[in-house]
């Protein structure tokens, strides 16, 4: 059956003649079927290879809402992240696709390679990178796992039935799970709830974990600054830089 499509960048709302709607996206992550099986992402309906070499996939259309920052403290979200981070099949699939483990040093190198030139020349951001180089945390490859890489609240969808899904897998990578955890805590969880959040997730609450949280928290701000800058969202670029300053001023003095 043919579809009508309404394009929003590389995403589409497709509708069949009978009125059934689907969400269509170009060149999405090949791990979507595995994510759907784990009930982390919406159900995948089909995939097709187009004549120009691009891949098109269709997922079930979800009627619901995007989570707000105030929604991000739910235990349901921690449960989804735990399921993602502990999924050996997803991790093995990424490895077969050519993804390699990224150590903290690799992450810093990746940022320097991928960040726009204007950010590379930013004096304050360079000082942050220098500090991160001097304080690289320990890394155990056997503890590394699949991470989403961009846990903004706008990438979480709640259906009318109350199911929550994580979408937009363009930033997925293999690294320390603290990559995702630090983003959550630094951006959405008040400090007085960090202990409960971390212990519910499965971390011990000690100085080693907090030092790692401080390091990956800074990196999460750098990542978001880059994403917003690439999307020409300068208001959020400035908000993230300001939030990074506040985070460093507040927690850096305690170490």
Model-derived segments and spans:
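Active-site beta-strand-loop-beta-strand hairpin of nuclease catalytic cores
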Residues: 15-22, 158-164
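Short, small-residue-biased leader/transition segments that mark boundaries at the very start
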Residues: 3-8
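A glycine-centered beta->alpha junction motif in the catalytic cores
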Residues: 50-70, 105-116, 219-234
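An alpha-helical support segment within catalytic cores of ATP-dependent transferases
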Residues: 1, 89-149, 254
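Conserved catalytic-loop position in the HRD/HxD motif
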Residues: 145, 150, 155, 168
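Helix-rich C-terminal or lid/interface subdomains of diverse kinases
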Residues: 186-188, 200-255
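A conserved alpha-helical element in kinase catalytic cores
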Residues: 9, 16-87, 188
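Active-site Asp-x-Gly
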Residues: 159-209
């Amino acid at each position: 059956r043919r579809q009508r499509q309404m394009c929003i960048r590389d995403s589409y709302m497709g509708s069949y003649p009978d009125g059934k709607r689907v969400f269509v996206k170009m060149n999405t992550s090949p791990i979507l079927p595995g994510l759907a099986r784990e009930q982390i992402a919406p159900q995948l309906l089909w995939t097709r290879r187009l004549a120009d070499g691009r891949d098109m996939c269709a997922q079930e259309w979800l009627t619901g809402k995007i989570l707000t920052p105030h929604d991000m403290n739910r235990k349901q979200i921690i449960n989804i992240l735990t399921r993602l981070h502990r999924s050996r099949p997803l991790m093995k699939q990424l490895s077969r696709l050519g993804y390699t483990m990224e150590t903290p040093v690799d992450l810093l190198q990746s940022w320097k390679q991928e960040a726009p030139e204007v950010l590379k020349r930013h004096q304050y951001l360079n000082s942050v990178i220098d500090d991160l180089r001097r304080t690289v945390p320990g890394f155990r490859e056997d503890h590394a796992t699949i991470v989403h890489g961009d846990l903004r609240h706008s990438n979480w969808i709640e259906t009318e039935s109350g199911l929550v899904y994580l979408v937009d897998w363009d930033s997925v990578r293999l690294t320390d799970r603290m990559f995702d955890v630090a983003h959550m805590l630094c951006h959405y969880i008040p400090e007085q709830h960090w202990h409960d959040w971390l212990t519910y997730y499965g971390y011990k609450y000690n100085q080693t974990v907090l030092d790692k949280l401080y390091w990956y928290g800074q990196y999460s701000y750098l990542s978001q600054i880059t994403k917003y800058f690439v999307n020409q969202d300068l208001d959020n670029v400035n908000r993230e830089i300001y939030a990074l300053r506040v985070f460093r001023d507040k927690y850096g003095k305690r170490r």
